[in-house]
């Protein structure tokens, strides 16, 4: 890295103490983005409690005695939405039906179109009917920031549709208008935005649908049970719990309410750096932004929570359905035909494996998965031009594009992308402190969180907050000089063994082996137990012996 002789201001101990005890995850001008799976910033105390209660419900399995089944795909939401909790998953479900001269028939009378692959007993099991001529795999979608997505006005989504491709750009996305389950039949249709076919418009509808269809739990919005392969006699024999099975708890919330709270209050995943990457220009240049619309603003309605109302979000989706050519799976849902899919959001993309609705871009590196996913947008359908343009990119342009897409879901300061801000990342921060200028395309941009072109003391305050949030102890001060060890290392102290303690640290009271602020019987016991080893070596000869005992006794008393 380039080095500068004018280094940023050294972080003071007072500033560290201030940011270390911050409850808002902000300090010195740096406000951390929530991690994927965290609650929204700005929730009230009551809303935060609803989020955590909902998260618990989301992860808690149902049993047959509480209504599970008789046929289902999983016993709890987290089993599918697991990366992180509420996010993408690697669990697949199966859709089936008949292709009748180009028209999809869902075989509802035989349990279609969703196969429930599990059952509470062998005798209640559901199978793909022999009549089915269409069988399709669907991967688990993400529930990240559902409340923010739900709050995008219908009119804003509709403003982007161009079903007849009037502008001739090859993109003819359209709104999938649907009726929420909680609305009356005479209510106006809403712009669908959830599900692979945008077949769901509200979070409550999504919760009710998944609760019944994926877990077999009937509820107030879908009070009838799924019969195994449509066999009502088998249903009567297998299902002993009265419907609806989801009833309000002691606080008046049904299960579908609880998981709706959780999904609505999930935060927008991070994007690091937040803007300015050349790869986003490449993304736009090859036409990806025609469908993957970066930015939206949620409605400014008085009925919305403060944490949701009037917020700018960057999901990278238009929430329209598009003809996806060879990616078509032959399944129709609602008004979305066999070739159409909703543009998936891209936030938290870097953690997604597999990619695509059928999981066909899986394994390998992130870059390999992305390359496969983009290539599969062609050679036919609305994504074909972008797929062709991607194939013509230079190696440098591809790298820039991959770096940008990899920023979607990257945590700030997490240089090694292991989902933990720790001493390994601290070493990189210390190196980045010496850089003359940091751009959004530099590796050091992950530490330049306020994007002022320097990794300095302000960014270090944010680093300490991020490390503390991840459960790392940032309070160590080996020489008791008032400057935390992490700050000393950031400012240039060596830490070759990466333990978060400066290698040249001289403890203010080396004979205080127990660290209780005094040299006493406890330290003597430690030394005697370490006799003959290096564990209590005070004179630096590599062994604990008489000379070390003399040093300890000479220092007896308070440090």
Report the location of each language-model feature.
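Cellulosome-associated attachment modules in secreted, modular CAZymes
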Residues: 410-559
């Amino acid at each position: 890295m380039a080095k500068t002789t004018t280094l940023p201001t050294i972080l003071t101990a007072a500033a560290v103490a201030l940011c270390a005890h911050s409850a808002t995850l902000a300090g010195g001008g740096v406000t951390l983005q929530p991690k994927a799976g965290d609650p929204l910033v700005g929730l009230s105390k009551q809303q935060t409690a609803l989020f955590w209660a909902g998260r618990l419900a989301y992860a808690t399995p149902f049993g047959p005695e509480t209504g599970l089944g008789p046929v289902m795909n999983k016993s709890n939401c987290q089993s599918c939405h697991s990366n992180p909790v509420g996010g993408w998953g690697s669990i697949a479900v199966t859709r089936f039906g008949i292709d009748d001269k180009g028209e999809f028939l869902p075989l509802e009378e035989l349990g279609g179109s969703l196969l429930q692959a599990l059952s509470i007993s062998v005798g209640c099991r559901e199978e793909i009917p022999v009549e089915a001529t269409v069988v399709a795999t669907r991967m688990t979608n993400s529930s990240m920031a559902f409340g923010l997505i739900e709050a995008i006005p219908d009119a804003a989504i509709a403003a982007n549709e161009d079903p007849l491709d009037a502008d001739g750009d090859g993109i003819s996305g359209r709104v999938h208008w649907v009726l929420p389950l909680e609305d009356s039949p005479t209510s106006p249709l809403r712009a669908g935005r959830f599900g692979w076919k945008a077949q769901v418009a509200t979070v409550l509808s999504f919760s009710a649908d998944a609760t019944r269809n994926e877990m077999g739990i009937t509820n107030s919005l879908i009070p009838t049970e799924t019969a195994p392969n449509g066999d009502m006699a088998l249903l009567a024999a297998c299902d002993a719990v009265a419907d609806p099975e989801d009833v309000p708890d002691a606080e008046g919330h049904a299960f579908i309410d609880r998981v709706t709270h959780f999904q609505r209050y999930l935060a927008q995943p991070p994007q690091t750096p937040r803007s300015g990457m050349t790869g986003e220009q490449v993304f736009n240049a090859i036409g990806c932004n025609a469908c993957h619309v970066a930015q939206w603003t949620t409605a400014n309605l008085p009925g919305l929570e403060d944490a949701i109302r009037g917020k700018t979000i960057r999901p990278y989706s238009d929430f329209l359905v598009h003809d996806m050519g060879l990616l078509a799976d032959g399944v129709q849902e609602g008004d979305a035909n066999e070739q159409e899919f909703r543009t998936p959001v891209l936030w938290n993309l870097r953690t997604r494996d597999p990619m695509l609705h059928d999981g066909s871009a899986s394994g390998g590196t992130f870059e390999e998965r992305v390359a496969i996913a983009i290539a599969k947008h062609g050679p036919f359908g609305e994504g074909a031009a972008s797929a062709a343009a991607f194939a013509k990119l230079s190696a440098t342009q591809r790298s820039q594009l991959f770096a940008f897409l990899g920023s979607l879901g990257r945590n700030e300061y997490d240089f090694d992308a292991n989902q933990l801000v720790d001493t390994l990342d601290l070493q990189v921060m210390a190196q980045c402190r010496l850089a003359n200028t940091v751009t959004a395309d530099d590796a050091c941009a992950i530490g330049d969180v306020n994007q002022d072109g320097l990794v300095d003391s302000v960014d270090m305050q944010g680093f300490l907050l991020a490390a503390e949030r991840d459960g790392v102890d940032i309070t160590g001060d080996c020489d008791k000089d008032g400057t935390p060890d992490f700050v000393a290392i950031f400012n240039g102290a060596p830490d070759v063994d990466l333990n978060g303690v400066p290698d040249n640290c001289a403890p203010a009271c080396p004979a205080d082996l127990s660290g209780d602020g005094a040299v006493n019987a406890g330290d003597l016991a430690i030394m005697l137990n370490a006799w003959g080893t290096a564990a209590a070596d005070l004179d630096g000869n590599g062994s604990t012996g008489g000379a070390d005992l003399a040093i300890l006794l000479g220092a007896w008393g308070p440090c």
